[in-house]
């Protein structure tokens, strides 16, 4: 066995078990936002803001066990999809066009971490100019965006990340492609990923124009109920003492949610949303003075994803109610004189437009 294989095996054995997603108590808003983005990546990612120590990173990393498998081209640094031209590299597309055989394997969707101090080259990848000039080849060293293609890119403390890098991430997530240009040489590759950011609002907010680019915005608050706090602490202690036994207890519930997600991804295209509901969604966005049409689009997508997750082929008003705050709270203009928070404002407008009585 080679030294590299030995290191890989040791690393694999030392990998810390992940806390089960279904064992996380509370924080339903954050969990729902993550699941819906896995069902429909076109929702546009999620920004999770909340107090320190509320389980933001734990929940995001716990998602890895629920992610379905995808088919990728073997030994391809971009996780190319052998069937979708928008998700394959130029090299793979050329092989397919030339009727060459392209071997594939099944692999789990990956979560890629973007460190806070990452440089633009580390994120986007680099071109070896010397090799390009001397040998006439596009020697490209892929970055994190290549690794994240068809997966999830997680940025902790995204509000502390350089604005320029946030722009690059959002542009790539929206367009699905990353282009690197150096000294007149250009390389592009697919970079379609779900962008998940988390942060503490005390450490600074994202600029509104960047915030608007995230499909959803979840707000996480510290649990106040003493009984619930005790339960969370006890569960965490049990996991730390014996992760394998703890994970075993949640095996079935994990498998159930994973199956639900896989089925929802398959059925998503069949979910219908009545025109009347779409008109009411746009009316809410209009009356709340939401800039642009991103809000309307994301609500429609998220409502369909929720209906698919719950095993239905038709969107109901309750689906819209459940996701509308996640989709709009970060798109409202902030008025320092208003005492009502943006989430409550969105819900009140929903009840007003749909002609329903507010739930106490």
Curated annotation (Swiss-Prot):
Look up the record and give one Gene Ontology term from the biological process aspect: chlorophyll biosynthetic process
Q: To which protein family does this belong?
A: Belongs to the Mg-chelatase subunits D/I family.
What does the subunit section of this Swiss-Prot or TrEMBL entry state? Answer: The magnesium chelatase complex is a heterotrimer consisting of subunits CHLI, CHLD and CHLH.
Q: Which residues pair up as cystines?
A: 285-327
Q: Which SMART domains match?
A: AAA
Provide the binding site for ATP.
50-57
Q: Which organism is it from?
A: Mesostigma viride (Green alga)
List the GO molecular function terms.
ATP binding; ATP hydrolysis activity; magnesium chelatase activity
Among CDD domains, the record links this protein to: AAA (cd00009)
| Primary role | Involved in chlorophyll biosynthesis. Catalyzes the insertion of magnesium ion into protoporphyrin IX to yield Mg-protoporphyrin IX. The magnesium-chelatase is a complex of three subunits, CHLI, CHLD and CHLH. The reaction takes place in two steps, with an ATP-dependent activation followed by an ATP-dependent chelation step.
The annotated modulation of its activity is: Redox regulation; active in reducing conditions, inactive in oxidizing conditions. Thioredoxins f and m mediate the reversible reductive activation of oxidized CHLI.
Instruction: Spell out the protein name for this chain.
Output: Magnesium-chelatase subunit ChlI
GO cellular component, alphabetical, reads: chloroplast
Domain of life of the native organism = Eukaryota
For this protein, the Enzyme Commission number is: 6.6.1.1
